[in-house]
Amino acid sequence: MKNPNRKADVRRAADGIANRADTLVVVASHGGSAIQYAKWISDILETDMVPANRKYLGYTSLYKNIIYVGCVKEGRIDTLGLLQQNYANFNLDGKHIITVAVGLGDPTDAYLSKLMEYNALTSFGESFYFLPGRSSVEKRKAGEMVKLDRCMKDLPKLYGKEDAEVIGLRLAKGYDGVDREKIQPIIDEIQAVRSNRYQPEISESEGSASDGSDDL
């Protein structure tokens, strides 16, 4: 007896393969919350995922939609500059690029504006999102403390007084703002793109994120 659901199963499988082939999640993380967010996004959207390094960044040329997830290090989204520098080489023109920053600050207008400025996001990509991250005091190695002290001294140079104080406190005391629900706007955007329903908004930024290592 033929299975009446067989054709539907085959069609759904084919759709899944097509979706995986149209979107790539690129993640710059060393095992922290940025990679956790990237995995959630990739699983829900059924996409491929690669690390943000010279060996794999070129794969972005093969996909229609790129979701770049990176932890914030002293105002910079980790390794994003390498992708931006190779914009032409990777044929990124015309692709739907979403940049996701994972850091420790609150998503104030001032803080997000600084991140956009430091990472040249006003002229790169379609959308920018900010997700809340994590700072694990227990996981720090002795050698990291010197670097941490220097970073905390530099915070007032990077951000406004209130934003610098929030980040400094979370670095010193530890913080875990990771929230799976925060990725929903990113999921919604890619699903809208896939169904030709996407309409760009004037401003898109949400959340806040960080790596298992400390994000700034």
Where are these regions (language model features)?
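Structural motif
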Residues: 22, 64-67, 96
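The conserved SAM/SAH-binding core of class I Rossmann-like methyltransferase domains
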Residues: 26, 50-52, 100
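Short, solvent-exposed polar/charged micro-motifs at secondary-structure junctions
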Residues: 59-62, 138-140
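A short, well-structured beta->alpha microelement
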Residues: 45-59
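Short, well-ordered alpha-helical microsegments
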Residues: 34, 56-59, 76-77, 108
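Glycine-rich, N-terminal phosphate-binding loop of Rossmann-like dinucleotide-binding domains
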Residues: 69-72
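N-terminal beta1-alpha1 ligand-phosphate binding loop
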Residues: 20-44
